[in-house]
Amino acid sequence: MYLLFCPCIREPGLRASGITTERDILAFDQVLSRCRSYGIDMRFLPCPETLYLGADRSPATFSERLDTPDFRHLLDQMEREIRSTIADLGVPYAIVGVDSSPTCGVNKNWRSPTGRETGRGVFLDRFPDIPAYDVYAVAMSRIYLAGPLFSEAERTWNIRLAQYLRSYAYDVYLPQEIGDSSASRGMDAHLEIFSRNLSALENTDIVVAVIDGADADSGTSWEMGYAYAKGVPVIAVRTDFRMVGAIEHVNLMLEQSAVVTHNLEELREALPCPLPVS
């Protein structure tokens, strides 16, 4: 399994002058680190804008400077070369692009000065058969796994979920793995566990929360609420078939603040960019 990358993720200097932010650099670094940590093969595409306009260039939309026969000819040539590589290596799992780019955008692109348009940039649009993810989606690699951990069955399920998420190249923080799984502890241990869990919540990209049972675990509910208030996406896992109301699977405040999934397949589909590594 390998990924095709837009080259500016590794070399931000290829981008137009002045558009790359510190947040962009952090996302680029997180993506590269994720792939290196899990041994994911990274193949980098050439940059059509740099080849056509040069490295030191001001920002411009497609219609302003790229809508020319010469640029289309360049894209034709680049596509042939990339298709040849794919014929040798096999189809990549996905392309990692950079939204807003007129050539390498995934969900949005600058086609004209009137504003960003929905859809891929003109270069990535030549590969509709290959899934594409924006670099920010791939950078969301840290998961806080919240759930009850009081019984052997609960802890076993949590471990299974953590292993499942790690098999898609996610860095999973599981509280029970740092000692939050025993009733025999003093107040100092309570404070240490709370502080470590809170720090992990502060630095996570996603919260995955187990909400099985007649009522969701109170600690898990707190963690979900904290994440939601911080703007962190929450994905809930409820395999319990019981309902708490006519149309509610669980308390409506939890249900409305999360994407609720009911099995591992639905959980995988709800993740922003699962990368299979096992």
Where are these regions (language model features)?
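N-terminal glycine-rich phosphate/adenylate-binding segment common to multiple enzyme folds
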Residues: 82-113
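Short connector loops at secondary-structure junctions
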Residues: 40-59, 137-139, 173-181
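Short catalytic helix/loop segments, enriched in acidic residues and glycine
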Residues: 21-39, 161-166
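Conserved catalytic or regulatory cores that recognize and/or transform ribose-phosphate-containing ligands
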Residues: 137-278
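Divalent-metal-activated hydrolytic enzyme cores
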Residues: 52-86, 116-140
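Short glycine-rich His-centered loop
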Residues: 9-21, 103-105
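Short Gly/Thr/Asp-enriched flexible loops that form oxyanion-binding sites at enzyme active sites
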Residues: 102-127, 219-228
